[in-house]
């Protein structure tokens, strides 16, 4: 069996120990969060899948969204090191690279899932359709400022309170629409404004 693997995938197997070491380094990061064993197993399997996979990434699961996006009260959301702490603590990366930006939301999963059934509005990039929350949500926007070899990175942390824009996908097993990605966390203008029929903020004169 091993001979077959080495013949079929010689280079990935040579690099695999380094990837496994990275995964171990992730788990050694000092964090206040204690992930269940099943979450750790899922992360390990996800790491292997990302390494060997040549196709598109599989849609995020409910548990992955809860683990990597949703947060609970703890560290102040306006803390300057919030993103550095949470990004590394929650192992937020894509194909062995740190993500350029990320959002953490202070809300429950059921509340986030309900947004999938709200009206469509333009996304931040103006291309895809997003669903927008009806109320304001607190969260943190993380912007990558310096990227080094995993697990080293630096993020700028920006507290926001605004309307969440998300994309959703259909989950066959659950027969429901579930959150896929967080597109933006739009802060309402400081002065008076209203939402047009397209869901776009219009500033009154």
Curated annotation (Swiss-Prot):
Instruction: Return the GO cellular component terms, semicolon-separated.
Output: extracellular region
User: What InterPro entries does its record include?
Assistant: RNaseA, RNaseA-like_dom_sf, RNaseA_domain
> Disulfide bonds, which pairs?
116-168, 123-130
Q: Which GO terms describe its molecular function?
A: nucleic acid binding
* Domain of life, source organism: Eukaryota
Provide one Gene Ontology biological process annotation. defense response to Gram-positive bacterium
Location(s) in or outside the cell: Secreted
An example Pfam family from this entry, by short name, is: RnaseA
User: Which positions make up the signal peptide?
Assistant: 1-26
Q: Which residues form a coiled coil?
A: none
The tissues where this chain's protein is expressed are given as: At the mRNA level, widely expressed. At protein level, restricted to epididymis. Expressed in spermatozoa (sperm head and neck), with higher levels on ejaculated and epididymal sperm than on testicular sperm (at protein level). Expressed in the epithelial cells of the epididymal tubule (at protein level). Not detected in muscle.
Q: Which UniProt keywords apply?
A: Disulfide bond, Glycoprotein, Secreted, Signal
Q: Which SUPFAM superfamilies is this protein grouped with?
A: RNase A-like (SSF54076)
Q: What are the annotated glycosylation sites?
A: 131, 143
Q: Which family does it belong to?
A: Belongs to the pancreatic ribonuclease family.
Functional description taken from the UniProt entry: Does not exhibit any ribonuclease activity.
What is the name of this protein?
Answer: Inactive ribonuclease-like protein 9
Q: Per the UniProt entry, what species is this protein from, by scientific name?
A: Homo sapiens
